[in-house]
């Protein structure tokens, strides 16, 4: 159950980050007032996802040691890098991909210890 909550916290946080990116992409080049920006559905999705992710994270911290749970959040780096590359078509260089592999290796190593 704890690992499912940890995964949910990661996914909600990533959803919030992606929604933030979509919100600012929609604002780019448009001369929008702050009241118009506040009505962006992407912004509200970001706030909801990040707020929900925070609440789920608090549940995770009640069930898992922070020394186990927090390093697992580095999976967000991996997920967001994949989304940046394949959804937003952002360039990702070889050094960045190597970092992603190191993060995956670190998470796997820490996951075996827990």
UniProtKB/Swiss-Prot annotation:
Locations listed in the record: Cell inner membrane
UniProt cross-references to InterPro entries, sorted A to Z: EamA_dom, Flippase_ArnE, Small_drug/metabolite_transptr
Pathway: Bacterial outer membrane biogenesis; lipopolysaccharide biosynthesis
Disulfide topology: none
Residues spanning the membrane: 41-61, 64-84, 91-111
GO biological process: lipid A biosynthetic process; lipopolysaccharide biosynthetic process
Task of the protein: Translocates 4-amino-4-deoxy-L-arabinose-phosphoundecaprenol (alpha-L-Ara4N-phosphoundecaprenol) from the cytoplasmic to the periplasmic side of the inner membrane.
Subunit structure: Heterodimer of ArnE and ArnF.
Name of the protein described by the UniProt record: Probable 4-amino-4-deoxy-L-arabinose-phosphoundecaprenol flippase subunit ArnE
Organism: Pseudomonas fluorescens (strain Pf0-1)
Gene: arnE
């Amino acid at each position: 159950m704890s690992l499912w909550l940890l995964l949910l916290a990661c996914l909600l946080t990533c959803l919030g980050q992606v929604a933030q990116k979509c919100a600012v992409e929609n604002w780019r080049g448009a001369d929008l007032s702050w009241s118009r920006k506040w009505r962006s559905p992407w912004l509200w999705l970001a706030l909801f996802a990040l707020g929900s992710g925070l609440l789920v994270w608090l549940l995770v911290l009640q069930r898992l040691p922070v020394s186990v749970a927090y390093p697992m959040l580095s999976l967000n780096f991996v997920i967001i890098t994949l989304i940046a590359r394949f959804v937003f078509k952002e360039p990702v260089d070889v050094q960045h991909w190597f970092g992603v592999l190191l993060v995956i290796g670190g998470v796997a190593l820490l996951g075996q210890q827990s």
